[in-house]
Amino acid sequence: MREVYLLRHGEKDAEGLLTERGKQAAETMRSVLPAFVRIISSESPRTIHTASLLTGEEPHPDPRAAYATTAASVSEEISAIAAEHGISFLDAARRHNNPDVLTGIDEQAHILNGLVDEVLGELGEGERALIVSHDLSIAPAMGYRGMSAESIEPLGGYVISLGDEGSSVQRFVAIAP
């Protein structure tokens, strides 16, 4: 069995950096996670920092683990919608209803799934990899794998497995600090 843990970064502040609570939660989770032979993050400081705290190692930043650049271009507007309605950034992006943003989110979901499939194909039997990404990419990507495309909590995500019987996806729930 080969496994890719696809996790969302830790809790972030208004500037997009990890909060103290987010850092503590990632450090706490480190003790329950398996060893990883590959550690990948987006190029965002919060995903790099999260991956480092989860593993004690520096990740390899990969732009395929990012979130849609079209969403980044209107992130202040989307963040304002999220704050006003008390909803996730992903749900706010959907509510923003900008066709370019929605297309970008969809395209990024396919790119992230391609990265997951590539990494799964490169792992040896019994090996695991970690990819730390963003809710805005993870949820839609897992929607294409038959899971709910709903927003996920910080440090939550999915475990995508590949074995003799094919592939499977299971939800991964973050532990509380």
Q: Where are the predicted features?
A:
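Conserved glycosyltransferase catalytic-site signature
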Residues: 44, 48, 109, 113, ...
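Glycine-rich phosphate-binding loop signature in dinucleotide/nucleotide-binding domains
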Residues: 33-34, 119-127
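Acidic, low-complexity terminal tails and accessory targeting/binding regions
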Residues: 31-32, 60, 67-87, 125, ...
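Active-site-proximal alpha-helix that buttresses catalytic centers in soluble enzyme cores
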Residues: 1-69, 93-105, 148-163
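Internal catalytic-core helix/loop-beta-alpha segment
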Residues: 87-123
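Short, solvent-exposed loop/turn segments at secondary-structure junctions
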Residues: 10-13, 45-46, 135-138, 165, ...
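Beta-strand elements within well-structured catalytic alpha/beta cores of enzymes
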Residues: 3-8, 40, 123-133, 137
